[in-house]
Each structure stands twice: as C-alpha cells, then as structure tokens.
Amino acid sequence: MAKADIHPKWYPDAKVYCNGQVVMTIGSTKPELHVDVWSGNHPFYTGTQKIIDTEGRVERFLRKYGMSSTQTSGDEQTKK
C-alpha cells in the first residue's frame, strides 16, 4: 500500500525571479524561486562570453615544472 500525503505540494505555475523581475514560470515544489543567473543573462547563452587568460596555460605548465621553451632536449645536447 502506498502512503498518503508524503509528497510535497506541487506548484505548476511557480514564478522564477531574477533581479526582482519575473523571468519565467515553471513547475516546482516552491511557489517562488529567486535566482541570480538564468539563461537570459548568463554570458555563455547571450554570446557575450569572454575568455580571460592572463597567462597562457602551456607557459604556466612549462614554468611550473622547470621546462622552458629555450632549453634543448637531451638528444640535441649529446649530438654536439
């Protein structure tokens, strides 16, 4: 036998608020949802995404492990 009254109340028209404005309605177990970011203002979805790479990842790896682009490999040093 299934237990009665164990499921939360379902709100089919729950309002989603972002910056004080209703941005969409969805089904939820809460009547109102307040979010900071949604697809309408997220940089990835709006096309305003910027990749900020202050230091190249490869250069950082090489510096971290003591390899620089000016060093020669061991094979080149033994041939001289």
From Swiss-Prot:
Part of the 50S ribosomal subunit. Binds the 23S rRNA. SUPFAM superfamilies: L28p-like. One of its GO terms (molecular function) is structural constituent of ribosome. It comes from Nostoc punctiforme (strain ATCC 29133 / PCC 73102). GO terms for biological process: translation. GO terms for cellular component: ribonucleoprotein complex; ribosome. Keywords: Ribonucleoprotein, Ribosomal protein, RNA-binding, rRNA-binding. This is Large ribosomal subunit protein bL31.
